[in-house]
Amino acid sequence: MSVDPLSSKALKIKRELSENTPHLSDEALMGLSVRELNRHLRGLSAEEVTRLKQRRRTLKNRGYAASCRVKRVCQKEELQKQKSELEREVDKLARENAAMRLELDALRGKCEALQGFARSVAAARGPATLVAPASVITIVKSTPGSGSGPAHGPDPAHGPASCS
């Protein structure tokens, strides 16, 4: 088996070039522009060029993945914050709804009592007595500054108030 002196000499020169090339840190490798990187890679073996380019790509991908993880964590925290705010709002509205239902039930009871009283008065006067029509005033109770409910009495579009 004979060794070709030219190929061993070329291999020796390539090794010397590889050994003599300045080692680039990961930060420096990532910070280089493509033009600067290509300038650095001139004169290196194809193996060394491939290795450095692959190393640079791996480092850049790592950075992209890390920033993606950070972004995802921030989005998750923001969504959890929004969820908590919405849950508090739902609880508040449920409490307000329950309070309004109680108030409505109390008003229905008063209305029914008044209607019963009106029927008993009408029955005591007898069937021949005409009862003058009465106007109904609706009082809406709301918390100050809530802005709910009519501002100036009942809505004429909905007709007279009833208990049901």
UniProtKB/Swiss-Prot annotation:
Subcellular location: Nucleus
Induction data: By oxidative stress.
Gene3D superfamilies associated with the record: 1.20.5.170
Signal sequence interval, chain numbering: none
Alphabetical list of Pfam families matching this protein: bZIP_Maf (PF03131)
Residue ranges occupied by any bZIP domain in the UniProt entry: 51-114
Tissue specificity: Expressed in the term myometrium and kidney.
A GO CC term assigned to this protein in UniProt: nucleoplasm
Keywords of this entry: DNA-binding, Nucleus, Repressor, Stress response, Transcription, Transcription regulation
Renumbered residue ranges of the record's region Disordered: 141-164
InterPro entries: bZIP, bZIP_Maf, bZIP_sf, TF_DNA-bd_sf, Transcription_factor_Maf_fam
Disulfide bonds: none
Region: Basic motif, residue numbers: 51-76
Composition bias, Low complexity: 149-164
CDD domains in UniProt: bZIP_Maf_small
Protein family according to the UniProt entry: Belongs to the bZIP family. Maf subfamily.
Oligomeric and partner information: Monomer and homo- or heterodimer. Interacts with MIP. Forms high affinity heterodimers with members of the CNC-bZIP family such as NFE2L1/NRF1.
Task performed by this protein: Since they lack a putative transactivation domain, the small Mafs behave as transcriptional repressors when they dimerize among themselves. However, they seem to serve as transcriptional activators by dimerizing with other (usually larger) basic-zipper proteins, such as NFE2L1/NRF1, and recruiting them to specific DNA-binding sites. Interacts with the upstream promoter region of the oxytocin receptor gene. May be a transcriptional enhancer in the up-regulation of the oxytocin receptor gene at parturition.
Protein name from the UniProt record: Transcription factor MafF
